[in-house]
Curated annotation (Swiss-Prot):
Keyword RNA-binding on entry: yes
Pfam families: Ribosomal_S20p (PF01649)
Superkingdom, taxonomy of origin: Bacteria
GO cellular component term, pick one: small ribosomal subunit
UniProt-recorded Gene Ontology molecular function terms: small ribosomal subunit rRNA binding; structural constituent of ribosome
Keywords of this entry: Ribonucleoprotein, Ribosomal protein, RNA-binding, rRNA-binding
Biological process (GO), any one: translation
UniProt organism field: Paracoccus denitrificans (strain Pd 1222)
Region (Disordered): 1-25
Protein name: Small ribosomal subunit protein bS20
Xref: NCBIfam families: S20
Gene: rpsT
Amino acid sequence: MANTPQSKKRARQLERRTAVNKARRSRIRTFLRKVEEAIASGNAEIAREALNSAQPELMRGVTKGVIHKNTAARKMSRLSARVKALATA
């Protein structure tokens, strides 16, 4: 339990930041899910568009500190490889 005024303020800030970061993470997951669904549908063009729209969201998450840059790079690399394989298949 926060007792001092400073710790009470910090608790309020933490609540706000948690809500914002949760929304950001959710938005990133939504974009990634759209790419996954596009890949599953087998349509290379839709998958490419979904990937192109997901990339800025991932990078924004990195900039805002929601996800680590290596995590974003790994996700983009794996999704790009799958979309590329879909296009060549």
